[in-house]
């Protein structure tokens, strides 16, 4: 009988069951939401060819000559009739200018704009977006980076088709890191994919709160209407040209999520770990400015992970100790241990399935062991970068350099 158990074990069991139910709810409603969206969109007909508004692709670049030479031909060969590509060159000192001149000669839809190195009153990335918006000839702006490659020639079509709905002002697209074999690279790949599931899942299930500038589309009219040219509220901060902009303009009814694999963008940043660390640190700083409701979802998910796994393992250990060391009939111990193990296995299986099915929905190679191995570690990574960003918050001000 349960009455034979100490009160602290009973309390631990109650905490375990409640936390497990919360985790189950979050897995089904948030973490699996992107996968269901991708499957639903895959079954929908192709983009309506009658809706093909002009699009301006804004490509931010800083000393990325090699990446531009590799990725610009892909951007300039999209299956879309009316678009232009504008490279925003942030004071590059490598062979970027040579690459840009060559591309200007090859394509009449290619343009470039150089960010003045003397600018100190505004983040160069935000200034680049502002210059790109002013230089663009179309109302639909599609942001990406020089080191990012679209997965297909239909990338623009997939991202832009959502603007057929006049209420849609922002479209969020999926981003993954290029697959590499080293341990650190795979860790970075898993972390970004994990955050992608949470970001898009929370956007679909709760409310939008951020986005990635590697794959982000929005209306130019929305950009200019947002607090005087898009960045007024956080003008003095270096980061925020993508996530804080989305946080400012996004509502539940004006944001669409594109999850088709043809709309995927692969980030080929090198060295990957440094790029990942800088991006993580930047998000650790800007996340404090996100909306409250998504933050509650994120914290609840992190806390209930520990309140599920640790009490569950404690119950298994306690009942196993009783079976081995205490004389008598242990039917209750076996029952409690079986229930605890079953619930833990169900959660683990659901965790692995979510990552596996989501990766397959985006035509990515699944990482089956990483969700289990890093289940309790990833919230600590998040806390680490948030604390580090808080301690170095002055470095995120305009005019400061060096984030790490």
Go through each PLM region and give its residues:
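Long helical/loop segments within the catalytic core of UDP-sugar-dependent glycosyltransferases
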Residues: 111-124, 128, 158-233, 284, ...
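Acidic donor-binding segment of Leloir-type glycosyltransferases
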Residues: 72-118
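Catalytic donor/gating beta->alpha subdomain of glycosyltransferases that bind UDP-sugars
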Residues: 163-195, 224, 228-298
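Short aromatic/hydrophobic "clamp" motif used to bind/position activated sugar donors
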Residues: 141
């Amino acid at each position: 009988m349960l009455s034979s158990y100490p009160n602290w074990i009973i309390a631990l069991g109650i905490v375990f069951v409640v936390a497990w139910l919360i985790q189950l709810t979050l897995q089904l409603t948030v973490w699996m939401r992107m996968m269901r969206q991708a499957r639903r969109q895959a079954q929908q007909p192709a983009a309506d060819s009658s809706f093909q508004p002009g699009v301006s692709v804004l490509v931010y670049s800083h000393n990325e000559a090699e990446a531009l030479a590799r990725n610009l031909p892909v951007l300039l060969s999209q299956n879309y009739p009316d678009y232009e590509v504008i490279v925003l060159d942030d004071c590059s000192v490598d062979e970027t200018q040579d690459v840009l001149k060559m591309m200007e000669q090859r394509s009449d839809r290619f343009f470039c704009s150089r960010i003045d190195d003397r600018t100190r009153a505004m983040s160069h990335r935000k200034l680049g977006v502002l210059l790109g918006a002013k230089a663009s000839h179309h109302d639909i702006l599609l942001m990406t980076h020089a080191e990012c490659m679209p997965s297909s020639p239909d990338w623009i079509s997939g991202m832009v088709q959502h603007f057929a709905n006049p209420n849609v002002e922002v479209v969020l697209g999926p981003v993954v890191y290029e697959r590499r074999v080293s341990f650190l690279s795979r860790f970075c790949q898993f972390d970004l994919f994990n955050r992608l599931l949470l970001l898009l899942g929370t956007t679909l299930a709760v409310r939008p709160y951020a986005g990635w500038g590697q794959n982000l589309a929005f209306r130019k009219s929305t950009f200019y209407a947002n607090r005087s040219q898009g960045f007024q509220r956080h003008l003095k901060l270096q980061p925020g040209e993508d996530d804080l902009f989305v946080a400012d303009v996004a509502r539940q009814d004006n944001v669409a999520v594109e999850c088709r694999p043809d709309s995927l963008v692969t980030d080929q940043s090198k060295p990957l770990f440094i790029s990942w660390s800088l991006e993580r640190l930047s998000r650790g700083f800007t996340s404090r400015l996100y909306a409250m409701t998504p933050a509650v979802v994120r914290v609840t998910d992190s806390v209930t992970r520990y309140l599920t796994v640790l009490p569950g393992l404690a119950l298994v250990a306690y009942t196993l100790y009783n079976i081995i060391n205490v004389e008598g009939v242990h039917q209750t111990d076996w029952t409690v241990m079986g229930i605890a193990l079953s619930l833990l296995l169900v959660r683990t299986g659901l965790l692995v399935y979510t990552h596996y099915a989501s990766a397959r929905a985006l035509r990515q190679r699944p990482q089956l062991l990483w969700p289990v191995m890093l289940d309790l570690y990833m919230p600590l990574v998040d806390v680490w970068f948030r604390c580090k960003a808080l301690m170095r918050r002055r470095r995120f001000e305009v005019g400061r350099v060096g984030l790490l």
